[in-house]
């Protein structure tokens, strides 16, 4: 979940967007398709536009400006860029079909995109193989954004997972659609009938939240969550990696994470990767929990060896994995911005951009491909003040205020290419990483798609 910045935090004119990490489809917007291990600046992208939100999906990226314009780039095989075609675009380009329809928020799933307009309407484009577009009788994919019917409710927050989506309305009702969680639920809850919202291909109300008012929602690979106006966190779906802070293998009904897990403080913001979560409380403390084997949690680990989730009734206790309960890495206290990729994270603390977690494609921005086990500053951005951060599954984006003196900018190389200068320079190295991504993803999801191409994007 990306926090809505206040008016005082609006991006100044002297700002620039930086991108790094996986780039097999041009999702960094740099005009080429080579992975980038250090942050690189997109020349003049933010001038004179001011950026409101940045985020990414499986192999694509999206930026929303203060004026409500949507810019997209990267993988477009299923039309997830909403440009009316299926050609990949390695540089940020405006989604012209949305001109005159200001966008408030955008959420990127693996191969689809959900948009929220300023008047509370939800749009979708991309793959619809699992009903993730919220249009039950629609085509297998949609290359232009189309409206989703949410029972005439005004929506205030959206989230996109691997193969499902979630929305919260102004009245605090939560809707879910897409069948991405259903196969996991059937496997872990044999003989049980799953609630409709797990199998619906159109928005279906999430039952079990009737006594709470959702302010925001989030979606992981096989789980969902909501944050209420009372500062409570509810979770449902798969608990394979302890991401639900519960002993059940699968939660078919939302359950609240008890307040003592957050030191009895109200939660004010929450974010989700594929299999881990990050939350911030009213005093600025940060809590992380869930999968930890790539450094996702940013804190010292208990042993992870030997833990295995067995098939069982969802209400029977399972062997709780290490780090399945929220715990606070003190170094993250006071973060003003946070974003989670599939297994890595970005945060801004005191104007400094920090990264940690999975780093196979260089998305932690330290110039290496070694996992980062504790939050550390992105050295290449130390001379700039971080304003916003956003993650795709395996790539990173940051909006930074540039120093007054250009000579102070570290690593000033700019590799942005105009459309006329684009060259497809994918190397064998990128192909090898795509193969590694596919092997790693098989651990995260037991259901595979033959046409998936793993590259390190969400």
Swiss-Prot record:
RCC1 repeats lie at residues 15-67, 68-119, 120-171, 172-230, 231-283, 284-351, 352-402. Interacts with SEC5. The interaction occurs only in the presence of magnesium or manganese and is stimulated by dCTP or GTP. Keywords: Cytoplasm, Guanine-nucleotide releasing factor, Nucleus, Phosphoprotein, Repeat. It comes from the Eukaryota. The keyword Nucleotide-binding does not apply. GO terms for cellular component: cytoplasm; cytosol; nucleoplasm; nucleus. It is found in: Cytoplasm; Nucleus. Disulfide bonds: none annotated. The modification Phosphoserine is found at residue 427. Residues 426-442 have a biased composition (Basic and acidic residues). One of its GO terms (biological process) is signal transduction. The gene is SERGEF. It comes from Homo sapiens. Residues 420-458 are annotated as: Disordered. This is Secretion-regulating guanine nucleotide exchange factor. PANTHER family: BTK-BINDING PROTEIN-RELATED (PTHR22872). Pfam families: WD40_RLD. Probable guanine nucleotide exchange factor (GEF), which may be involved in the secretion process. Its main location: cytoplasm. One of its GO terms (molecular function) is guanyl-nucleotide exchange factor activity. InterPro entries: RCC1/BLIP-II (IPR009091), Reg_chr_condens (IPR000408), Signaling_Regulatory_Domain (IPR051625).
């Amino acid at each position: 979940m990306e926090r809505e910045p206040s008016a005082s935090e609006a991006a100044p004119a002297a700002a620039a967007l930086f991108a790094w990490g996986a780039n097999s489809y041009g999702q960094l917007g740099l005009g080429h398709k080579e992975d980038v291990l250090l942050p690189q600046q997109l020349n003049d992208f933010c001038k004179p536009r001011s950026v409101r939100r940045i985020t990414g999906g499986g192999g694509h990226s999206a930026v929303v400006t203060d004026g409500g314009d949507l810019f997209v780039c990267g993988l477009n095989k299923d039309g997830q860029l909403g440009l009316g075609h299926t050609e990949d675009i390695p540089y940020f380009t405006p989604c012209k079909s949305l001109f005159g329809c200001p966008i408030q928020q955008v959420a990127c799933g693996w191969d689809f995109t959900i948009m929220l307009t300023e008047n509370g309407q939800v749009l979708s484009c991309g793959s619809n193989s699992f009903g993730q577009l919220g249009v039950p009788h629609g085509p297998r994919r949609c290359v232009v954004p189309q409206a989703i019917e949410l029972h005439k409710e005004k929506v205030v927050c959206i989230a996109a997972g691997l193969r499902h989506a979630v929305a919260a309305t102004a009245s605090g009702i939560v809707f879910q659609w897409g069948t991405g969680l259903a196969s996991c639920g059937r496997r872990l809850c044999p003989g049980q009938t799953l609630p409709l919202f797990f199998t619906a291909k159109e928005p279906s109300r999430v039952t079990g939240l009737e006594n709470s008012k959702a302010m925001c929602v989030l979606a992981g690979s096989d789980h969902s969550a909501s944050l209420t106006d009372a500062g409570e966190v509810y979770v449902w779906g798969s608990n394979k990696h302890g991401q639900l802070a519960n002993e059940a293998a699968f939660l078919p009904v939302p359950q609240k994470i008890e307040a003592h897990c957050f030191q009895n403080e109200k939660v004010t913001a929450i974010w989700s990767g594929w299999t881990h979560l990050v939350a911030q409380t009213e005093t600025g403390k940060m809590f992380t929990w869930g999968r930890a084997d790539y450094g996702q949690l940013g804190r010292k680990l208990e042993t992870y060896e030997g833990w295995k989730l067995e098939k069982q009734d969802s209400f029977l206790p399972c062997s709780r994995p290490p780090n399945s309960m929220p715990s606070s890495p003190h170094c993250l206290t006071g973060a003003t911005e946070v974003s989670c990729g599939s297994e890595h994270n970005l945060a801004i603390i005191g104007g400094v951009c920090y990264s940690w977690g999975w780093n196979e494609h260089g998305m932690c921005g330290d110039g290496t491909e070694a996992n980062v086990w504790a939050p550390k500053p992105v050295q290449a951005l130390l001379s700039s003040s971080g304003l916003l951060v956003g993650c795709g599954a395996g790539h990173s984006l940051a909006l930074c205020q540039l120093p007054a003196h250009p000579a102070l900018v570290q690593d000033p190389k700019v590799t942005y290419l105009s459309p006329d200068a684009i060259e497809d320079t994918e190397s064998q190295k990128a192909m090898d990483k795509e193969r590694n991504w596919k092997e790693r993803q098989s651990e995260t999801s037991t259901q595979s798609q033959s046409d998936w191409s793993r590259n390190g994007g969400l």
